[in-house]
Design a protein with these regions (language model features):
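Bacterial N-terminal signal peptides that target proteins for export
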Residues: 1-11
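Bacterial N-terminal signal peptides
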Residues: 9-21
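Signal peptide processing junction and immediate N-terminal pro/mature segment
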Residues: 21-29
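Carbohydrate-active catalytic/glycan-binding domains of CAZyme proteins
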Residues: 28-370
Length: 370
């Protein structure tokens, strides 16, 4: 059994225990002494955070993060990573981490946005993203409505760390999870989104939610994989300017990746950045636990698969963002170093490097593997 499988077995076994609560991360305490097998240490230990979306506003880095709760998954979710609802992940609000640089002290901003202040949302505020335009900061977030369907909402603030005020309705035509907003050099903005299984992409064929749709990927291994969605945003970046379409990910021969290609096909966690005029679309492969990337010449794709950015971390989920700050590139990601529980994560950062040909050097989150 692999190192990752051993850890996953331990996590699943722990879920069957009666005492499912987790002790809180120690408040106002410095990060623990570095352990030799971790490449990076948690940015903060006073709060559990995940799904980091990093941006540079006014020269400072702001990381928009999910806020993991300490309730633990219900006993019905003994395998919460495989069921169709993602019941172990019950996040109700967001946290922002800000810093002068990834190696500087981190300020934790709370009271960013709470589900109680989102009129249309019922539960599960998952991975967010943010953008800036004309003096206003925009927070994009998925949540389930009262029908149990994931929609994507938007909230605004005059300050990068909020508090944000949500609009009364989700973005028209939005569905699934993991919004990632990319502003191109010409000022046009695009949203990438989607996630399989608990993210409901497979329940939204043609953008229409089917509550009785499959809980997981229904496609045969030799069928085209589900693809991420992309849509240009209106000038005010509050709504879609067009109907979402597939952002096609292809292999080196130009053929769409297949559903059975677990090490390369899209699962969730879209991110877009630009490097030397090319569009780098990165994402999580889900069950194989990689962060990988594909490159294209248009924000719509197609994107040709290139390789792995991040090898598997502690915990089941893997989610990331990539940002440039003062001439250096950084990867933000999360693992479960602090808690050892997949639903209680901590955000980390490490420097990212390109090769001369524009490919990205693969990062191992462990200095030495167990």
């Amino acid at each position: 059994m692999t190192r990752h499988a051993n850890r996953l077995s331990l996590v699943i076994a722990a879920l069957g225990m009666a005492a499912l609560g987790a002790g809180p991360a120690p408040a106002n305490q410095d990060a623990p002494a570095p352990k030799p097998h971790y490449l990076s240490q948690p940015l903060v230990t006073s709060v559990y955070t995940a799904d980091p979306s990093a941006h540079v506003f006014g020269g400072r880095i702001y990381v928009y993060a999910s806020h993991d709760t300490e309730e633990g998954p219900p006993l019905a979710d003994v395998e919460p990573f495989k069921n169709s609802e993602g019941g172990a992940f019950k996040m109700r609000d967001y946290v922002v981490l800000s810093m002068a640089n990834p190696q500087a002290p981190v300020q934790v901003h709370r009271n960013v946005l709470d589900i109680a202040d989102v009129p249309w949302a019922a539960r599960q505020m998952w991975a967010p993203d943010a953008a800036y335009r004309n003096g206003t900061y925009y927070l994009y977030f998925p949540a389930k409505d009262r029908a149990g369907a994931f929609r994507i909402g938007v909230a605004t603030s005059k300050q990068p760390a909020g508090p944000f005020r949500a609009r009364p309705e989700p973005i028209k035509g939005s569905f699934s999870i993991d919004p990632a907003v990319f502003v191109d050099d010409d000022g046009k903005s695009y949203m990438y989104f989607g996630g399989l299984s608990g993210g409901q992409l497979q329940k939204n064929i043609g953008g229409v939610y089917d509550p009785n749709g499959p809980g997981g990927d229904p496609r045969a291994k030799d069928e085209q994989a589900f693809m991420p969605q992309v849509a240009k945003l209106r000038g005010d970046i509050l709504e879609f300017a067009e109907k979402p379409r597939e952002a096609l990910i292809v292999d080196e021969k130009g053929k769409p990746l297949l559903s059975g290609d677990g090490d390369r096909r899209f699962f969730e966690a879209s991110w877009m950045h630009k490097y030397r005029g090319k569009y780098y679309f990165s994402y999580s492969t889900g069950g194989s636990h990689f962060i990988v990337y594909a490159v294209g010449s248009s924000p719509y794709g197609p994107f040709t698969y290139k390789g792995k950015i991040l090898l598997p971390v502690d915990g089941w989920t893997t989610h990331h963002s990539i940002v440039e700050h003062k001439g250096r590139w950084w990867l933000f990601y999360a693992d479960t170093q602090l808690s050892g529980k997949t639903w209680l994560r901590n955000v980390k950062a490490t420097e990212l490097f390109y090769n001369r040909d524009g490919t990205i050097r693969t990062i191992d989150p462990f200095v030495t593997r167990k």
